[in-house]
């Protein structure tokens, strides 16, 4: 039963989420944020690297998923985000984890069924898929969503299994079921 860590990189808050995949079932293990406020950038990167490394050593995930950098309107923000992402990936690779990368749109499509979903929709679906009773922080929910996306992409999670896990909430309609006869 592999453990998957998802990372939602950020220069001030880096979210992490760990799930266990057992066949078609996903189980919540841990989630939270690595806070790096009020330090200069090299110190923030050091905290991200050390935080990711500590979490991986504690839980021992065998797979990792990281959200790719989006193109921000502010180039400085995009550079900082890229640096934070690099620190997290370096920590994962340093511990011999293979890193899968997904765009925000791919993650949202996998978890919510809609690539332009908002943060609230992602949080609610993460809660539903993992049977959580408390809404995770936004960054932690995004990291859990990355881990869920990777579990879906890794092969044994069929679309039908995902729909069953959701209790039919996201029932799809075939074209034939929407036609008038």
Curated annotation (Swiss-Prot):
Pfam families documented for this protein: RuvC
GO molecular function: crossover junction DNA endonuclease activity; DNA binding; magnesium ion binding
Keyword Hydrolase: yes
Reaction catalysed by this enzyme: Endonucleolytic cleavage at a junction such as a reciprocal single-stranded crossover between two homologous DNA duplexes (Holliday junction)
Active site: 8, 67, 139
Record-listed Mg(2+) 1 binding positions: 8, 139
Family that this chain belongs to: Belongs to the RuvC family.
Subunit structure: Homodimer which binds Holliday junction (HJ) DNA. The HJ becomes 2-fold symmetrical on binding to RuvC with unstacked arms; it has a different conformation from HJ DNA in complex with RuvA. In the full resolvosome a probable DNA-RuvA(4)-RuvB(12)-RuvC(2) complex forms which resolves the HJ.
HAMAP family in the record: RuvC (MF_00034)
Protein name (database record): Crossover junction endodeoxyribonuclease RuvC
Native organism: Acinetobacter baylyi (strain ATCC 33305 / BD413 / ADP1)
Taxonomy of the source species: Bacteria, Pseudomonadati, Pseudomonadota, Gammaproteobacteria, Moraxellales
């Amino acid at each position: 039963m592999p453990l998957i860590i998802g990372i939602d990189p950020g220069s001030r808050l880096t979210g992490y989420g760990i799930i266990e995949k057992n066949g078609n079932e996903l189980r919540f293990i841990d989630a939270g944020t690595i806070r790096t406020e009020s330090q200069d950038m090299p110190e923030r990167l050091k905290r991200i690297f050390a935080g990711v490394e500590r979490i991986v050593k504690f839980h021992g995930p065998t797979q990792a998923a990281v959200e790719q950098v989006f193109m921000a309107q502010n180039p400085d923000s995009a550079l900082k985000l890229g640096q934070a992402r690099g620190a997290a990936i370096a920590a994962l690779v340093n511990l011999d984890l293979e890193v899968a990368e997904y765009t925000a749109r791919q993650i949202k499509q996998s978890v919510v069924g809609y690539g332009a979903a908002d943060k609230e929709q992602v949080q609610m679906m993460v809660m539903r898929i993992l049977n959580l009773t408390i809404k995770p922080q936004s960054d932690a929910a995004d990291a859990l969503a990355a881990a869920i996306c990777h579990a879906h992409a890794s092969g044994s999670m069929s679309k039908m299994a995902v729909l069953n896990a959701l209790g039919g909430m996201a029932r799809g309609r075939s074209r034939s079921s929407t036609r008038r006869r």
